[in-house]
């Protein structure tokens, strides 16, 4: 391993796509042809190597990004298989953070689907170079050229077509390589392992020439010398074309587009060649952003084996044989088993025990790993997703990952009291694995409440609790994660006094509460916060050491708002005055005063209930359009847009989450199962007063 494990030989890639575009099948074929998998696993039979959790095999969707290492030519390819279902976009975002490049798989029939757009935008956020594989070219209605147009219209991407399909639908038999200007045809009987080159079929010559010219026009722009050569009529060599495609892919000047049918074993080897030829190695990425712990300075750290060790933990998984596994991407330096490193986010030391290279669900022990590698570490105590592991002497914190707030919650209780402790352990393990899943206890009812990104997300958590931890649970109806806020500025002056024998308590606070959107001089770093606290105490009216007590009190009490007990968000609290007593004042006294000030002051701020609004996208045949729009309107939805997509219509609407429970069944019956939808969290908005009254009455 170590001889060829040099940085320029590594490709860290993700394979991402819409659910059902054939992403897992494509990954399976890659593992098969790179010699890592001896039997091809079919998703629809529930046997794919990457989909190794039982729930994934049953549902035929990929939930956990399993990291797999394989070889092609003399390169090492680390593949992160990412989920394509909208409830799991957090997993995709997490994988994109540690990748150097990605292959976006598109369905040749459906083209660019809603989740593909979400994933593409996430990849844009992390500047991930990528190429496109138009899959399912053997299916009825597959249209490569329409897909390419959709890449432009839908994603605003610049596709660079480097292959054309030979034959369509059931007659699809190979591709035209526009770099070599040769046809590549697969033998059906050899499971796609055998293919041969031949001249381009006569009926495709003109189309191949047309697309070859388009390809050259785009790539020569990246190099003046080659441009001159091209314009003067000289032949541009295949090597020059490849070099420029690589340059343009890495700089995101364009996205190479390939085609094939993973299920029919056609087009996978040229896809692997393209991964190696065009996607970046860690050296091409060059740097990773982070902060030096000793100085607090933001810095760009070089990706290099000779630099001090720095790695990012991007995934935690429970393995039935090894226990907890932490997947890390090493950005610089190297580690060996037995070394001690530091988790710089938590300031805790971690000893490196077993290090494993993962192949979907098999593992290989390694003693050393270095920059560019993706490995799993067994037995880390304090490290969670998004933490940095670093060299003890030169400590750095790599860029943190941001995780969205959950929008749906439900109460769970174990079926027997004996399972209470087991359930607590199971949920805390699952929460460590998945930062978009939260667990809390409702103090009033004593119930355990779990929160997540959607119904499917929580269903799978409960399913895993049952299978992996053997905990049976009763589940409450899903609840919407409402919030509260204030709509006008209010001021409160409150004195907390308790002087009945023994040590007394005294604290006076004067606080101004204001809606965040009305704060004029809000700092940039505070704009995305739910709550901002500032002290404007001058002249020691409240001593410095007591001010954290005020902030702590407000932070705790805002979890139970004044309308219906939901967390209070989007407001700023400014401590402007106060008073203290030399003997009777304490941090605790100021904490109590702040809580009471909140309770008394907030009702004066005209508080309102907020609800999560989801962006819902429905794709439907024309004939059901009227019924579907009528139904969305009846759910308090606001239609944002209606666009034709092929022979279907796409309706985008903002709909309150509270109205979306069970929508999948309604949509199925409205469209005889032909329409599909996806939804993602958009924003919080005020609840209409008549709905707010119903919610308050239920609390």
From Swiss-Prot:
<dbReference type="InterPro" id="IPR005517">
    <property type="entry name" value="Transl_elong_EFG/EF2_IV"/>
</dbReference>
<dbReference type="InterPro" id="IPR053905">
    <property type="entry name" value="EF-G-like_DII"/>
</dbReference>
<dbReference type="InterPro" id="IPR041095">
    <property type="entry name" value="EFG_II"/>
</dbReference>
<dbReference type="InterPro" id="IPR004540">
    <property type="entry name" value="Transl_elong_EFG/EF2"/>
</dbReference>
<dbReference type="Pfam" id="PF14492">
    <property type="entry name" value="EFG_III"/>
</dbReference>
<dbReference type="GO" id="GO:0003924">
    <property type="term" value="F:GTPase activity"/>
</dbReference>
<dbReference type="GO" id="GO:0003746">
    <property type="term" value="F:translation elongation factor activity"/>
</dbReference>
<dbReference type="InterPro" id="IPR031157">
    <property type="entry name" value="G_TR_CS"/>
</dbReference>
<dbReference type="Pfam" id="PF00009">
    <property type="entry name" value="GTP_EFTU"/>
</dbReference>
<dbReference type="InterPro" id="IPR014721">
    <property type="entry name" value="Ribsml_uS5_D2-typ_fold_subgr"/>
</dbReference>
<keyword id="KW-0251">Elongation factor</keyword>
<dbReference type="InterPro" id="IPR020568">
    <property type="entry name" value="Ribosomal_Su5_D2-typ_SF"/>
</dbReference>
<dbReference type="GO" id="GO:0005737">
    <property type="term" value="C:cytoplasm"/>
</dbReference>
<dbReference type="InterPro" id="IPR005225">
    <property type="entry name" value="Small_GTP-bd"/>
</dbReference>
<dbReference type="InterPro" id="IPR000795">
    <property type="entry name" value="T_Tr_GTP-bd_dom"/>
</dbReference>
<dbReference type="InterPro" id="IPR009022">
    <property type="entry name" value="EFG_III"/>
</dbReference>
<dbReference type="Pfam" id="PF00679">
    <property type="entry name" value="EFG_C"/>
</dbReference>
<dbReference type="Pfam" id="PF03764">
    <property type="entry name" value="EFG_IV"/>
</dbReference>
<keyword id="KW-0963">Cytoplasm</keyword>
<dbReference type="InterPro" id="IPR000640">
    <property type="entry name" value="EFG_V-like"/>
</dbReference>
<dbReference type="InterPro" id="IPR009000">
    <property type="entry name" value="Transl_B-barrel_sf"/>
</dbReference>
<protein>
    <recommendedName>
        <fullName>Elongation factor G</fullName>
    </recommendedName>
</protein>
<keyword id="KW-0547">Nucleotide-binding</keyword>
<dbReference type="InterPro" id="IPR035647">
    <property type="entry name" value="EFG_III/V"/>
</dbReference>
<comment type="similarity">
    <text>Belongs to the TRAFAC class translation factor GTPase superfamily. Classic translation factor GTPase family. EF-G/EF-2 subfamily.</text>
</comment>
<dbReference type="GO" id="GO:0005525">
    <property type="term" value="F:GTP binding"/>
</dbReference>
<feature type="binding site">
    <location>
        <begin position="135"/>
        <end position="138"/>
    </location>
    <ligand>
        <name>GTP</name>
    </ligand>
</feature>
<dbReference type="GO" id="GO:0032790">
    <property type="term" value="P:ribosome disassembly"/>
</dbReference>
<dbReference type="Pfam" id="PF22042">
    <property type="entry name" value="EF-G_D2"/>
</dbReference>
<dbReference type="InterPro" id="IPR027417">
    <property type="entry name" value="P-loop_NTPase"/>
</dbReference>
<keyword id="KW-0648">Protein biosynthesis</keyword>
<dbReference type="InterPro" id="IPR047872">
    <property type="entry name" value="EFG_IV"/>
</dbReference>
<feature type="binding site">
    <location>
        <begin position="17"/>
        <end position="24"/>
    </location>
    <ligand>
        <name>GTP</name>
    </ligand>
</feature>
<feature type="binding site">
    <location>
        <begin position="81"/>
        <end position="85"/>
    </location>
    <ligand>
        <name>GTP</name>
    </ligand>
</feature>
<dbReference type="InterPro" id="IPR035649">
    <property type="entry name" value="EFG_V"/>
</dbReference>
<feature type="domain" description="tr-type G">
    <location>
        <begin position="8"/>
        <end position="283"/>
    </location>
</feature>
<keyword id="KW-0342">GTP-binding</keyword>
<comment type="function">
    <text>Catalyzes the GTP-dependent ribosomal translocation step during translation elongation. During this step, the ribosome changes from the pre-translocational (PRE) to the post-translocational (POST) state as the newly formed A-site-bound peptidyl-tRNA and P-site-bound deacylated tRNA move to the P and E sites, respectively. Catalyzes the coordinated movement of the two tRNA molecules, the mRNA and conformational changes in the ribosome.</text>
</comment>
């Amino acid at each position: 391993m170590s001889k060829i494990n040099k940085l320029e030989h590594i490709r860290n890639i993700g394979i991402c796509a819409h659910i059902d575009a054939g992403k897992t099948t494509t990954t399976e074929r890659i593992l098969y042809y790179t010699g890592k998998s001896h039997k091809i696993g079919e998703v629809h039979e529930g046997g794919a190597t990457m989909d190794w959790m039982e729930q994934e095999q049953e549902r035929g969707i990929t939930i956990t990004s399993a990291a797999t290492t394989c070889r092609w030519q003399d390169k090492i390819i680390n593949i992160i298989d990412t989920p394509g279902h909208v409830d799991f976009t957090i997993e995709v975002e997490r994988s994109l953070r540690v990748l150097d490049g990605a292959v976006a798989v598109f369905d040749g029939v459906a083209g660019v689907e809603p989740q593909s757009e979400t994933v593409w935008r996430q990849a844009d956020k992390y500047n991930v170079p990528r190429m496109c594989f138009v899959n399912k070219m053997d299916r009825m209605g597959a249209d490569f050229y329409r897909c390419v147009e959709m890449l432009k219209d839908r994603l605003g991407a610049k596709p660079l077509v480097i292959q054309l399909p030979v034959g369509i639908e059931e007659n699809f038999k190979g591709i035209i390589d526009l770099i070599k200007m040769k046809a590549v045809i697969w033998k059906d009987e050899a499971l796609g392992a055998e293919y041969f080159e031949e001249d381009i079929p006569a009926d495709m010559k003109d189309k191949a020439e047309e697309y070859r010219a388009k390809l050259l026009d785009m790539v020569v722009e990246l190099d003046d010398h080659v441009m001159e050569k091209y314009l003067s009529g000289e032949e541009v060599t295949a090597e020059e074309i490849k070099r420029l495609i690589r340059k343009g892919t890495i700089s995101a000047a364009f996205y190479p587009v390939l085609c094939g049918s993973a299920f029919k074993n056609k087009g996978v080897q040229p896809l692997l060649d393209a991964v190696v030829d065009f996607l970046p190695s860690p050296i091409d990425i060059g740097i990773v952003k982070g902060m030096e712990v000793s100085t607090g300075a933001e810095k760009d750290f070089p990706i290099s084996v000779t630099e001090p060790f720095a790695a990012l933990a991007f995934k935690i998984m429970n393995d039935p044989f090894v226990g907890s596994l932490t997947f890390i991407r090493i950005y610089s330096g190297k580690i060996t088993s037995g070394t001690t490193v530091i988790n710089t986010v938590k300031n805790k030391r971690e000893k490196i025990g077993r290090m494993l290279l993962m192949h979907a669900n098999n593992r290989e022990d390694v003693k050393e790993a270095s920059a560019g590698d993706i490995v799993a570490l067994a037995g880390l105590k304090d490290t969670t997703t998004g933490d940095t592991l670093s060299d003890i002497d030169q400590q750095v914190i790599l860029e943190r990952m941001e995780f969205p707030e959950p929008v749906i919650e439900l109460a769970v209780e174990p079926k027997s009291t004996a399972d209470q402790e087991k359930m607590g352990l199971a949920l805390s393990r699952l929460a460590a694995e998945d930062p978009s899943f939260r667990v809390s206890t409702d103090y009033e009812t004593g119930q355990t409440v779990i929160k997540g990104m959607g119904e499917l997300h929580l269903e799978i958590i409960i399913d895993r609790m049952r299978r992996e931890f053997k905990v049976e649970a009763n589940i409450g109806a899903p609840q919407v994660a409402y919030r509260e806020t204030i709509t006008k500025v209010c001021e409160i002056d409150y004195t907390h006094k308790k002087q009945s024998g023994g040590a007394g308590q005294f604290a006076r606070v004067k606080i101004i509460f204001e809606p965040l959107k009305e704060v004029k001089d809000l700092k940039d770093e505070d704009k995305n916060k739910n709550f901002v606290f500032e002290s404007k105490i001058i002249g020691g009216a409240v001593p410095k050491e007591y001010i954290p007590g005020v902030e702590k009190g407000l932070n705790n009490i805002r979890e139970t708002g004044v309308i219906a007990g939901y967390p209070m968000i989007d407001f700023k609290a400014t401590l402007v005055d106060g008073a203290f007593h030399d003997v009777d004042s304490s941090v605790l006294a100021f904490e109590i005063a702040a809580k009471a000030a909140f309770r008394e002051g907030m009702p004066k701020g005209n508080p309102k209930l907020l609800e999560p609004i989801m962006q819902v996208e429905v794709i439907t045949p024309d004939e059901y359009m009227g019924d579907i729009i009528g139904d969305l309107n009846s759910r308090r939805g606001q239609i944002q847009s209606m666009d034709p997509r092929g022979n279907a219509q796409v309706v985008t609407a903002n709909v309150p989450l509270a109205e979306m429970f069970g929508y999948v069944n309604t949509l199925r019956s409205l469209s005889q199962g032909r329409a599909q939808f996806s939804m993602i969290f958009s924003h919080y908005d005020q609840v209409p007063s008549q709905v707010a009254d119903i919610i308050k009455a239920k609390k």
